């Protein structure tokens, strides 16, 4: 979203913050989670199949969602994965949350939802963004919840060896409207800027006193 849009005249509005994601962990893919009956559902396209699976998983996910009374849950993200190799696709819970946020915002019936996907209507986002997996070796350091700079450890020890930490980061794209302002904002009357915002994820880190532990650190999560 457009993080800041200020008019050129004596008018001001508040920019909207970014959404963060609950701190849940998962492994696997749609093939391992969707079950054996998906092939017989009679859906006419791969897109409909994908949406159908996501809707089922969202229903099941309600059981393990953090309590609404836990305000800190809004700070945490599901963008971290421990793996022996670079993940080939975005985190499943990230896709679930993105799709759920769209459904909640649209507030539509199931049938209308499938036929009103913004991608199908040719809609464009206000700000262009890019998402990719980043290793701890590329991040090196990060800021924790107390504001201290900590070292992000590249490998996490497990019973059978070590796994690497990967972070799924989203930031504003250097191409397109990132430099020119937010898409859809009238430049004659408003100044706007696309900005990368951050949220917290849990990662294995080391502080300046060489103490190793799991801490919440900030990573890029939206534009």
Curated annotation (Swiss-Prot):
GO molecular function annotation: growth factor activity; nerve growth factor receptor binding
Keywords from the named record: Cleavage on pair of basic residues, Disulfide bond, Glycoprotein, Growth factor, Secreted, Signal
Glycosylation sites: 107
UniProt subcellular location: Secreted
SUPFAM superfamilies (UniProt xref): Cystine-knot cytokines
Pfam family, one: NGF
Residues of the signal peptide: 1-5
Superkingdom: Eukaryota
Gene3D superfamilies: Cystine-knot cytokines (2.10.90.10)
GO biological process terms held by the UniProt record: cell surface receptor protein tyrosine kinase signaling pathway; modulation of chemical synaptic transmission; negative regulation of neuron apoptotic process; nerve development; nerve growth factor signaling pathway; neuron projection morphogenesis
Cysteine disulfide links: 127-194, 172-223
InterPro entries given in the database record: Brain-der_neurotrophic_factor, Cystine-knot_cytokine, Nerve_growth_factor-like, Nerve_growth_factor-rel, Nerve_growth_factor_CS
The protein's role, per its UniProt record: Promotes the survival of neuronal populations that are all located either in the central nervous system or directly connected to it.
Family: Belongs to the NGF-beta family.
Protein name: Neurotrophic factor BDNF precursor form
């Amino acid at each position: 979203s457009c993080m800041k849009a200020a008019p050129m005249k004596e008018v001001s509005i508040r920019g909207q913050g970014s959404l963060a994601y609950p701190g849940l962990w998962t492994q696997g893919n749609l093939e391992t989670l969707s079950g054996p009956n998906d092939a017989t559902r009679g859906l006419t396209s791969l897109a409909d199949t994908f949406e159908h699976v996501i809707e089922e998983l969202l229903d099941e996910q309600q059981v393990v969602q953090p309590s609404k009374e836990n305000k800190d849950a809004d700070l945490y993200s599901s963008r971290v994965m421990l793996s022996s190799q670079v993940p080939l696709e975005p985190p499943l819970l990230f896709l679930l949350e993105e799709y759920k946020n769209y459904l909640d915002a649209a507030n539509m019936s199931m049938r209308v939802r499938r036929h009103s996907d913004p991608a199908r209507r040719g809609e464009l986002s206000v700000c262009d963004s890019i998402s990719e997996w980043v290793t701890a070796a590329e991040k090196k350091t990060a800021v924790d919840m107390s504001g201290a700079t900590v070292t992000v450890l590249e490998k996490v020890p497990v019973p059978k060896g070590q796994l690497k930490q990967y972070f799924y980061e989203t930031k504003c794209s250097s191409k397109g409207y990132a430099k020119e302002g937010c898409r859809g904002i009238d430049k004659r009357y408003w100044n706007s800027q696309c900005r990368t915002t951050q949220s917290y994820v849990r990662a294995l880190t080391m502080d300046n006193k060489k103490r190793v532990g799991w801490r919440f650190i900030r990573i890029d999560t939206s534009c």
